[in-house]
Amino acid sequence: MSTPTSFTFNIAYSVPINKDPSQPTLTLEEFWRGLHRGSEKPQLFAEYVADTEVLPNSKSANEFQRKLIMANGAVHTAKGVELLQDVRNADGLLDDGPDALYLTAVYELHVPDVEPGSERAKEIEREYAQLALGAARTVVETIRRWKVEGGLEDA
């Protein structure tokens, strides 16, 4: 009897929140409100998420956990798959001003039936790295757009 193989890929990206001085500046509070809004309505960030539930097990106002239910179009994750995602704003951050704000997104991808080190695994690493970086940038751009449009007041 053979053992099923599974490929696991971990990646993290940090993107500046206020990179472009010509764009409206986001404060930490505004960005956190935007993350909450997107967590309750993930389709606003990504069409490949069908639904979400913010779980009631938060330990503080600076963190929450949500369950995502994937839709069609998710890379390497089938429709209907449920994922748990932890979201937190690190405690004890020093406020060095808006230029010092970053979003760090950490992803862990599990892909069954792919051999670690195989060509398919390397292809997934390349594709998922691009997707993860793009997702982090999209979150920042979307929250900034909500601020400009007045949508953060609804969050």
Swiss-Prot record:
Pathway participation: Mycotoxin biosynthesis
InterPro entries (UniProt xref): AtaL, START-like_dom_sf
Result of knocking out the encoding gene: Impairs the production of acetylaranotin and accumulates chemically stable intermediate cyclo-L-phe-L-phe or shunt products such as 2-hydroxy-2'-ene-cyclo-L-Phe-L-Phe and 2-imino-10'-hydroxy-cyclo-L-Phe-L-Phe.
Record field: transmembrane: none
Pfam families: AtaL (PF08982)
Primary role: Nonribosomal peptide synthetase; part of the gene cluster that mediates the biosynthesis of acetylaranotin, a member of the epipolythiodioxopiperazine (ETP) class of toxins characterized by a disulfide-bridged cyclic dipeptide. The first step of acetylaranotin biosynthesis is performed by the NRPS ataP which produces diketopiperazine cyclo-L-Phe-L-Phe via the condensation of 2 phenylalanines (L-Phe). The ataC domain of ataTC then catalyzes the formation of bishydroxylation of cyclo-L-Phe-L-Phe.
Protein's UniProt name: Acetylaranotin biosynthesis cluster protein L
Lineage summary: Eukaryota, Fungi, Dikarya, Ascomycota, Pezizomycotina
